């Protein structure tokens, strides 16, 4: 099988930093360690409440990375302006609720279609690729196709929480549907070594986004070691 890309989300490095409002750990330093150990791109989620990643983090990462920056944002005007100023290689549009601990599900592309169209057009006009974070649902992918997005990221959280064949089948079918419609397919949310190995075997998925689990593993084994192991797991799944 072809090599699958690993995106490392470093949001919770910022969570650790912000716990004491210090300047350490430094996100750029951590991002470079991630890249040196197999990360193909770096992902950060700039939330409306700035609970972890700050505006300045995004600009610093863009200026200091030698791999693509994948910026996750809510589809609101404030974030659009920041994305255009930063010029990340890719923006991933995600749903966002202030009270949630983490992103709880995919975008409802069907109901947001009219709103998303000019938003995506503006990003494309600034040569920024666009990903939509969606449930593994054929109907949602069909609407995403009409928006001419570059990528779909399939929400793997339900599969990771319940590990059912039915949910895995949904991911398989959604990835195949992306391929049929010439949309690059990524996946992420809740992945650990075991679930990432399974999802990495799904045909037509070209990249995985993994964050919280890797940061937790880093507490025990170090960030470099944890990312190196994950890259090995997903590129050589049994």
Curated annotation (Swiss-Prot):
GO terms for molecular function: pyridoxine 5'-phosphate synthase activity. It holds the Pfam family PdxJ. The record marks 153 as: Transition state stabilizer. GO terms for cellular component: cytosol. Its main location: cytoplasm. One of its GO terms (biological process) is pyridoxine biosynthetic process. Transmembrane segments: none annotated. Catalyzes the complicated ring closure reaction between the two acyclic compounds 1-deoxy-D-xylulose-5-phosphate (DXP) and 3-amino-2-oxopropyl phosphate (1-amino-acetone-3-phosphate or AAP) to form pyridoxine 5'-phosphate (PNP) and inorganic phosphate. Homooctamer; tetramer of dimers. NCBIfam families: pdxJ, PRK05265.1-3, PRK05265.1-5. Belongs to the PNP synthase family. PANTHER family: PYRIDOXINE 5'-PHOSPHATE SYNTHASE (PTHR30456:SF0). This is Pyridoxine 5'-phosphate synthase. It comes from Ehrlichia ruminantium (strain Welgevonden).
